[in-house]
Amino acid sequence: MDLITLQNFLDNSSFLLLFLTMLIYWAGAAFPNVTWLPTLGTTGVAIANLCMATLLGARWLEAGYFPLSNLYESLFFLAWGVTAIHLVAEQMSRSALVGVVTTPVAMGITAFAALSLPPEMQTSAPLVPALKSNWLMMHVSVMMLSYATLMVGSVLAIAFLVVTRNRDIELKGSSVGTGGYRDKLGRSLLNNNHKQTTVNLTQSNGSGGTAILESVAVKPETVTLSPQRLNLADTLDNISYRIIGLGFPLLTIGIIAGAVWANEAWGSYWSWDPKETWALITWLVFAAYLHARITKGWQGRKPAILAASGFVVVWVCYLGVNLLGKGLHSYGWFF
């Protein structure tokens, strides 16, 4: 089997594995009593990750350069990064819900690369002069890893929003009381007592005694989130924060490396190219997220909404601006 045939086999195998793994994770969420499904899902993601790593290695051997020169190669590198960060996040959280939301992202990326791109884009070609630099590996690989990490962190924030929908809560370690799970008014969400409380309203009868005027049955507010869902929400919020905290410095390093490379290649550190502009917007969005978490003490839905918007911004930065075919970063894509 030559390297080209091996690559064709591995890209289709990666897509098929991730598709089946996505179904396994979804089945595990629908039938939580089937305890072996999450383990099978994790195994599937690990095998898919290995397939994509082998694909990129074969591509490197065939072409003679690090495989990040066009859309096909960068998509598979991105999918490899998403699956790698998925394994880290799943190990940290011990929750199968991570796979429920991350495997569709990885599967969609591989489907786009393996099934949608034209054959000429899936074959390796000589590097354009601008890419013949050692900065290709340094800049592009770090940027792609940052995209993958931020995507996983953002999609976990989206999962948090779904789990806590219609309920504005503050999580453990909040500034309200001594922590615990509380709604935005500070009411504990774990002391969910469905019993009615009878309140006796009394009045003096003028002879030293009391007379009951009325008995009122007070039913506590019904809490929509079970303790299990609240624990899951806390885990998702924490893991999302930590994963984004890992992706942000990678994005920062990637942008700095790109500026140095741009100065060597084009004589300017910053040209306000569409890709550069959206990279800055992406950096600002996640900088605002981390600033709100670290200095303002935001937790729960407000920072999760900001992180969820970052998922869209990352995709616009990575893929959207290149659909225009304009700017210094348009080579190797559609036009």
UniProtKB/Swiss-Prot annotation:
GO terms for cellular component: plasma membrane-derived thylakoid membrane. The keyword Membrane applies. It is a multi-pass membrane protein. Belongs to the CcmF/CycK/Ccl1/NrfE/CcsA family. May interact with ccs1. Required during biogenesis of c-type cytochromes (cytochrome c6 and cytochrome f) at the step of heme attachment. This is Cytochrome c biogenesis protein CcsA. It comes from Crocosphaera subtropica (strain ATCC 51142 / BH68) (Cyanothece sp. (strain ATCC 51142)). The lineage of its organism: Bacteria, Bacillati, Cyanobacteriota, Cyanophyceae, Oscillatoriophycideae.
